[in-house]
Amino acid sequence: MPSGALDRLMKLRDDPYAMARSWKERTGSKVLGFFCCYAPEEMMHAAGALPVRITGENRDISKSAAHLQSYCCSLARTGLDMALDGTLSFLDGTVFVHTCDTMQRLSDIWRLNAGFAVHADIIIPVRFETDSAWAYMIAELSSFKEKLSEFLGPIDDAAIIESIKLYNKNRALLSEVYDLRRANPEVLPYDQALWIVASSALMEKSEHNALVEEILSDLKEAPSPATDDRVPLFGIGSVMDQWEFLKMVEESGATFIDDDFCDGRRYFDTLAREDLPPVEAIAHRLWDRKTCPCKHAPSKERAKCIVEEAKASGAKGVIFFQFKFCEPHAFDYPHVKKALDAAQIPSLNLEIEQGSVSIEQMRTRVSALVETIKS
């Protein structure tokens, strides 16, 4: 009999920060928000805080328009709106990692207007794989550790190592969910698999680990479903929270078999080493993991990696989900698209924006891609 763990996680989608608010009320400890998956969550956790990811919201803007231009991405605009209208009032502070110009400037606006007790910026290098970039990354993470200590008290290296182990366990469990579904997409709707990953950054990791272990047990015990004849697709983008759209793709005769979303596989990609000093271990993971359009690593050329990953997943087509006014993904698209064309992998680029997705218009375009692949 199913444990109900998946149902408990899916209910969180209606109120993403419910677990964080409950945790704070229960423990009296601090909650720190972050936007980017390059944030060193293990350090925050080791300091006794709960790291919680801010992913914006599908909402109309009420307060942030006075601070941000209309050509900023909806992730920045809705995130700031949530801070200004009290939705994020449970936060004690926010950690910004440099990703793009919008987020870099949002950090200053946030610091001056959101009113949280602590504010930190981490400037992760844009270009990896040089000695100077490595030294700079170590210095930035060490500086962040010191700043956390000023706010939360001394952070013991042993505590960071334990947090690394806890987060590694979570990454391994999430990888198992994705790999299980890749082998048999019928076992779990894609939007639920993606939410299992996204919810990991919204609650205490030990609680999430327990729930995912139950979900995996349920999935492994479930009867084998019928053969899946849907077209397997690969998704590319930053944060993906357009759940109705993902369901629509499955209604169109396709399903996502894997992805390169920063709240999907890219979030749990690569374990941190447990045989190194903690700051180095965290730095190595950020250094070694899959890069996003905001970073560059010569040995992991992004277009080539995307093609290899799409092929390995068994995907027959690719859909790009590009936030309107997202410059990093806009610059990334032509290069990756060219590589996909050379590999004869059909693709579709969809512009999305939180709060204004036209499902039916996109349904027509997705159906056309599916029919093209089938033919």
Could you tell me what each predicted segment is?
Residues 1-30, 138, 142, 146-270, ...:
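A charged, amphipathic alpha-helical module
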Residues 3, 11-25, 29-37, 41-42, ...:
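Metallocofactor- and cofactor-centric catalytic cores in central/energy metabolism, strongly enriched
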Residues 60-69, 129-133, 265-272, 358-360:
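Short, charged, surface-exposed secondary-structure boundary motifs
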Residues 303-310, 315-317, 321-375:
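TerminUS-proximal long segments
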Residues 68-85, 295-307:
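Glycine-rich, highly charged phosphate/nucleotide-binding loops
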Residues 26, 37-38, 43-55, 237-311:
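Redox- and metal-dependent alpha/beta enzyme cores, enriched for Fe-S-associated oxidoreductases
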Residues 55-61, 123-127, 260-265, 353-354:
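Short, acidic/turn-prone active-site loops that include or flank metal/cofactor-
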Residues 78-150:
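Acidic/His-rich segments in extracytoplasmic proteins that coordinate ligands and/or metal ions
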